[in-house]
Amino acid sequence: SYASTVLPKVKRVQLGDALAQRIGQLAGPYCSSPEGTHTAQQLADRLNTDRTLPLLVLRGQRTLPITLPGGKIILFENMLTASDDPAVTAGYILSALAAFDHRDPLRAYLEQAGPFTALSLVASNNLSKTQVDQLAKIALSQPQTPSPRTALLNLFSTAKISSSPFARVKAGTEGQGLIAQDPFLTGSPYPVLTDGAWLSLQAICSDM
């Protein structure tokens, strides 16, 4: 939509923050622990994406993370506990990035919200609490955009992480393609996280 293309970057970040806050109220609270939060940032830095990656974690299960305007990514607890290999969690984050680059999440949410919300955004660069609530509920309920395989594999290659561990938790042809075209078939050349850091991230929801 037009609204999604004209919104300044600073406003996208603000809108993403507002949506994250409302999603936390609707489906949270977000999982948090000093060690786990620190490790989440370590993992984001490890992915070599040259962009800020604010990561949030919610309890529950999803097949895909939620991406928000401005770049925030919401993971779900199953994405940390589905495997003993942190490359799987890295894969979920990279898949969210590939999907974000492929299709602006704001555009997807505004298409569902309808023209009135989009016009409000164009007119004022802001949304009412009711409209933020509407978009947050859309983000929670709408299936997220799948990531294009080639773009996802490029992100795995840049991060120097094997795509096979992530592929094994994905069903069907998507998983098969990520294994067949894994840029590191013999395994990730560098550890994704230390064992201690990985355990602290997996336990981020445990103390709540």
Language-model features: locations:
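Peri-catalytic and regulatory segments of divalent metal-dependent proteins
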Residues: 2-107, 193-197, 204-207
